[in-house]
Swiss-Prot record:
The keyword Manganese applies. The lineage of its organism: Bacteria, Pseudomonadati, Thermodesulfobacteriota, Desulfuromonadia, Desulfuromonadales. This is Phosphoenolpyruvate carboxykinase (ATP). It comes from Pelobacter propionicus (strain DSM 2379 / NBRC 103807 / OttBd1). GO terms for biological process: gluconeogenesis. It comes from the Bacteria. The gene is pckA.
Amino acid sequence: MKFNDVTRGTGLEEHGITNANLIYWTPPTSVLYEQIIKRGEGLVSHMGALAVKTGHYTGRAANEKFIVDEPTCHENVAWGKVNKPFDPQKFDELYKRMLAYMDGRNLFVQDCFAGADREHRLPLRIITERAWHSLFARNMFIRATPEELEQHEPRFALINLPGFHAIPSIDGTHSEAFIIVNLGRKLILIGGTSYAGEIKKSIFTILNYILPVEKKILSMHCSANVGPKGDSAVFFGLSGTGKTTLSADSSRALIGDDEHGWDDKGLFNFEGGCYAKIIRLCPESEPEIFATTRRFGTILENVAINTRTRRVDLDDDSFTENTRASYPLTHIPNIVPSGIAGHPANIIMLTCDAYGVLPPISHLTKEQAMYHFLSGYTARVAGTEAGVKEPTATFSTCFGGPFMALNPTVYGELLREKISRHNVSCWLVNTGWNGGPYGVGERIRISYSRALINAALDGTLADGSFETDPFFGLAIPTSCPGVPSEMLNPRNTWSDPARYDDTASRLVAMFRSNFTKYQPYVSAEVANAL
C-alpha cells in the first residue's frame, strides 16, 4: 500500500511489531481529530482546539527516566541522578512485553524529522497507541513531504504506550511509569504516563547526545528569534521562565520556542511546533500565543473545559498549574519558515529568581556568561515537574539539566568557543521576583521583561550607563525606556535593605557551592566570575 493510504496492517516489522490491528500511517490532523473524538480521547473546544487530559502525570516524571547503559554510550553519558543507568537485559524483557501489549491494537505512526537543517536533521518514527499523542508528534516535529515519506528511513523510533504499566519488582523501574532511552538500539520506550512532554523531551535528550558527540554542534534548551535587520537572539531558560512568551514578539520573527542547534553556519530549530505553558494566559500581554488556543489543530493539555458549552478556562488550575498548548509553528503569524538563521548577536539567559535578589537585567562578561550557563540558576516553577507545587530555588546546568546526556562542560566549552568567535553579547534576565522573595515580592511584569530585552537587542542598553552589583559582580543598567529605574537595582526595591544583603549573600554562597564541581574543567577566570 502507498504512504498516502490512511491505514494499513503492516509496516512496523523492523520494530518487532508484527500483529497490530490497524496502523494509521502519518495521518493528517483532520483524521486524527476524527479518531480522537471517536475513541473518547478528548473534546473539541468551541473555537476548534482539542482539549485532552493526561491523568495521573501532569508533568514530567523526572525520576522515571533512564538511559540504557550499553557499550556505545557508556563512556560518554554523564551518569548520575539525571541520567540513571538501565540494564540492557531488563530493557529487552520490557520491550518484549510491550510488543505483546500491542498485539491486536490500533496504532498511530508519525514519520517526521527533528532538526530544520537538512544536513543535520534526524529521521524519526513516533509510534503511539493514542491518536492525540500522534497529533502531538505531528504538531511538534518537522513534517515530512509526501516525497520524503516514500523514502523515509527512521534513525530513531519512539514507542509511547500510556496504557502499558511497568512492574517495578520485575522491570527495575521506580514505578509503573518509565521513559527509557536506548542509544545503541536507537529506540525510546515510554509507558505508564500520558504526559505528552515526555515525547518531545526524550527526542531532545538524544539530540543532546548525538549532535555534540558526532558533529560538535551545540544543542541548546532555548528559544530563538530574528529581528528586522537579520540579527538573531537566543533565549536560554527552563520551563516556565518565559522562553516561549518573550521570544514570541510581533516585532521579531520566531525561529523556535524551545530547542535549537548552533553549528558553523548559525542557528536551526529542532522542532516544527511549540509547547507553551498557558496557565492564566493573558490575551493583552501574549496575544500571539493566546490566538493559538483558539485554532483547529492546537492541543490544550489539562486545560479546564465546560463540557456543555465547550468553552475553556485558561485561568483554572484545579487540575494542574502545568497547562499546555501544543501547536505547529505555522499557527504563529511571524515566523522564520525555514527554521534557520545566522549566528546570534545576543544571548539572553532567563532565570526565575525565587529569592528576588537578581536584577531584572544585567550585562555579562564572557566569563560570567559561561559561569551562569553552567550554573543554570532558576526556580522549579510550579507544575512543570510532578510534585512541585511552588517555586523552589535550584541549579539546572545549561538551563536544561534534565535533558543533558553529556558532561555539562561539553556544552559549556562549545558555548564559550562560539561566544568568543562571533563576539556575542550576553545578558542575564530575571523574570522572577522583585521587591522581596517569593511570597513577599511581586513577579516582574512580562511587559517590563519585554521592554528590557528589546532595549538589549536594539543596543539601547549597551549605549547607556551601568552600575556594578556588589554581590554578584553584575553590570546593571541605570535606566531603560518603559521600565521604572528604581526597580533595575533590586536592593532598592526591598523595604529592608539589610535583609536583601543577607539573602543575596546566601544566594552567592549557594552559587559558589554548586559551582565547585565544574572548577576542575574551567579556567580560573570563569571559576572566579562570581
